[in-house]
Amino acid sequence: MSLNPRDVVIVDFGRTPMGRSKGGMHRNTRAEDMSAHLISKLLERNNKVDPAEVEDVIWGCVNQTLEQGWNIARMASLLTQIPHTSAAQTVSRLCGSSMSALHTAAQAIMTNNGDVFVIGGVEHMGHVSMMHGVDPNPHMSLHAAKASGMMGLTAEMLGKMHGITREQQDAFGLRSHQLAHKATLEGKFKDEIIPMQGYDENGFLRVFDYDETIRPDTTLESLAALKPAFNPKGGTVTAGTSSQITDGASCMIVMSAQRAQDLGIQPLAVIRSMAVAGVDPAIMGYGPVPATQKALKRAGLSISDIDFFELNEAFAAQALPVLKDLKVLDKMNEKVNLHGGAIALGHPFGCSGARISGTLLNVMKQNGGTFGVSTMCIGLGQGIATVFERV
């Protein structure tokens, strides 16, 4: 494949094991320490990359307060081998934060404003809860439906609009756990999980190299027994068909194709296009549809050209309508989230965009795909998408 000098390539990807937010492996690890460990280990793994060449560390994080405040990108960077001469910024696009971090780095590379970037994101939802310090504007209900800030209810709405049944959602939730468990047993996550020290359920310090969030004993019967989590009267969305509240971080090294060539690095993939889109906040989960359509148009591709998709599983009631309208629902088992998704692995807000993109690249590498799309919905009505081509 012929690459242009300013094409944006992904050199490597790594993530922490996903930990439960309540009493999980990361309960005694701060968000910036988790991030710094990941950055350091990924740079060690890629010793052709000089940390002094890093132009900017761009880190996604949603709730930027407490240990995640005061520009956590810089806080984490200062704890690594990256010198003080490199810059750092923290970005938030809610759920899409670390994919936005990737896009920001890509746009800088494309416009000759840097060659080497470290991007990623973190959310320690056990230490900084999603609602900590949130103060919604009381006038918002004049501009959007009152429940638009309640993500579970927007998923209920989207599922109802598209005729998604409780049974379909339960089957999707089961699939996520089964595929994530299968991927774990087969070593499919080995290249992406950077082992970390953490504490087990008995309080002992140990090294974790697997996700503690996956529930291999999940069954359709156990899912069917769960009560609706958001709408007690007639609701269909449950805790078992929603993304888990977890702690985690993800990281990528990205650079210009020219710099990768100069360093003798074989990249994983090249970014072919990027897009963001807005939708009605009341159906925020629909955002991946227009975002993906935009990105495909910019890449000159059609949906049938895409070999694999990673769609963030915010809710089964949200994911299924998206797959339906992208015309890939009937190909889900061959193309979509082949290693499970956020229902099994969790959705640490600032982490997820880079996480699903990196998992996609590994799926493409393991299965020989050429084109892939990572996409996700974003609270309050947005979508974000990235089209990758394997190099």
UniProtKB/Swiss-Prot annotation:
Please classify the protein's predominant subcellular localization into one broad category: cytoplasm
According to the record's subunit comment, the protein's assembly and interactions are: Heterotetramer of two alpha chains (FadB) and two beta chains (FadA).
**Known EC number(s)?**
2.3.1.16
Which CDD domains does the record cross-reference, listed alphabetically? thiolase
InterPro entries named in the record: FadA, Thiolase, Thiolase-like, Thiolase-like_sf_Thiolase, Thiolase_acyl_enz_int_AS, Thiolase_AS, Thiolase_C, Thiolase_CS
Chemical reaction(s) catalysed: an acyl-CoA + acetyl-CoA = a 3-oxoacyl-CoA + CoA
Cell compartments where the protein resides: Cytoplasm
Functional pathway: Lipid metabolism; fatty acid beta-oxidation
Record GO cellular component, one term: cytoplasm
Summarize the protein's role. Answer: Catalyzes the final step of fatty acid oxidation in which acetyl-CoA is released and the CoA ester of a fatty acid two carbons shorter is formed.
Quote the catalytic residue positions.
Answer: C95, H347, C377
Q: What does the sequence similarity comment in the record state about its family?
A: Belongs to the thiolase-like superfamily. Thiolase family.
The alphabetical list of record keywords is:
Acyltransferase, Cytoplasm, Fatty acid metabolism, Lipid degradation, Lipid metabolism, Transferase
Q: Which GO terms describe its molecular function?
A: acetyl-CoA C-acyltransferase activity
Q: What is this protein's name?
A: 3-ketoacyl-CoA thiolase
PANTHER family in UniProt: 3-KETOACYL-COA THIOLASE FADA (PTHR43853:SF11), 3-KETOACYL-COA THIOLASE, PEROXISOMAL (PTHR43853)
Q: Which GO terms describe its biological process?
A: fatty acid beta-oxidation; phenylacetate catabolic process
EC class, as a word, reads transferase
